A protein has these predicted regions:
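Residue-level signal for inorganic ion chemistry
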Residues: 35, 78, 108, 140, ...
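Conserved SAM/SAH cofactor-binding pocket of Class I
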Residues: 110-214
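Conserved Class I SAM-dependent methyltransferase catalytic core
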Residues: 232-294
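Mobile active-site "lid"/loop adjacent to the S-adenosyl-L-methionine
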Residues: 205-237
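Generic C-terminal helix-cap and adjacent flexible tail
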Residues: 120, 277, 295-299
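Conserved AdoMet
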Residues: 37-117
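Non-catalytic accessory regions of SAM-dependent methyltransferases
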Residues: 1-56
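General small-molecule cofactor/ligand-binding pocket signal
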Residues: 96, 180-182, 280-282
Length: 299
């Protein structure tokens, strides 16, 4: 969304009446309130307080007309709100996102926590070098670099559009001095560092091709299929990432993956077939097996 001059103040009752009218036409209240916060600058607690003070003046970052246009594009054309406002809150970051770049999901935040835990259990003689395969918006790479300042990282994506967005986000958060952004497919751009990577994490596409047609239109029509389509069984990219780990990881290095909640057994089998030790599943916030880890055997 382009920057706009602050709108003229309105009363709390005018805003609440506008909100009621829009929701009467359809849509989720939580999503409209998210738009009010991200585009209008009005947080949930402030919105709640307005109910008690109907005559209070309210200053928004943009006009109700502008908010209405964005909401209609979301409700009628199913455009993701994150694309419409150009940002996505994720972990402790506010990442810029745009069409062509996958919108970071909250579940993926746990992959950073798993990576930080794994970092504490790495062999002491390993260089603190990590890689993010399929970086997209750069969410994982930026969060890990910010939380692990002693480390350096390599972030890979085959989409030039995604890589440009990730690099811009890295610049915003001041971590580009410790991340190299590399174009290419999975392990291929990392060849100069094969055998040196202490930690590799990846949230690759894992949705079976046949299931893409059944996704919510917000996802199906607007987010990049390149970041969603995992092939006929959903495991195509996961296989490539796991199979490369035996060469790419340093001895004792860790691989961390996100996958679909019904793929845990298959991913465990892939880790074992690749010769990785200590294959483990990990649960998401809903208690589903959504992540996996394995370690390259130490020499």
């Amino acid at each position: 969304m382009q920057e706009q001059a602050p709108a003229q103040p309105i009363t709390a009752e005018e805003l609440l009446s506008w909100r009621r009218q829009l929701l009467a036409q359809g849509g989720e209240p939580g999503q409209l309130d998210w738009l009010l916060e991200m585009a209008g600058g009005l947080g949930w607690q402030e919105l709640q307080a307005l109910r008690l003070h109907p005559s209070r003046p309210v200053e928004l970052h943009c006009s109700l007309h502008q908010l209405h246009r964005l909401w209609q594009r979301h409700r009628l054309q199913h455009e993701p709100l994150q694309y419409l406002v150009g940002c996505c809150p994720w972990r402790d970051l506010r990442l810029a996102v745009a069409p062509g770049v996958l919108i970071p999901r909250q579940d993926t935040e746990l992959l950073v926590e798993l990576a930080l835990e794994a970092a504490m259990d790495l062999p002491q003689d390993l260089e603190l070098l990590w890689a993010d395969l399929g970086t997209g918006s750069g969410c994982l790479a930026i969060a890990l670099a910010a939380a692990w300042p002693a480390s350096t990282g390599l972030a890979v994506d085959c989409s030039a559009e995604a890589l440009a967005q990730a690099s811009a986000n890295g610049q915003t958060f001041g971590v580009n001095g410790r991340i190299q952004w590399l174009g290419g497919h999975w392990w291929q751009p990392l060849r100069p560092w094969w055998g040196q990577l202490a930690l590799v994490l990846s949230n690759p596409p894992y949705i079976p091709t046949a299931e893409l047609a059944h996704l919510d239109p917000v996802v199906r029509w607007h987010e990049p299929s390149l970041a969603l389509d995992g092939g006929s069984d959903g495991l195509g990219a996961l296989r490539l990432v796991v199979e490369g780990a035996a060469l790419g990881l340093a001895p004792g290095g860790m691989l961390l993956l996100e996958h679909h909640h019904d793929q845990s057994s298959a991913v465990m089998a892939l880790l074992e077939a690749a010769g990785l030790e200590q294959p483990r599943p990990h649960r998401d916030l809903e208690g589903r097996w959504r992540f996996a880890s394995g370690r390259r055997r130490q020499s």
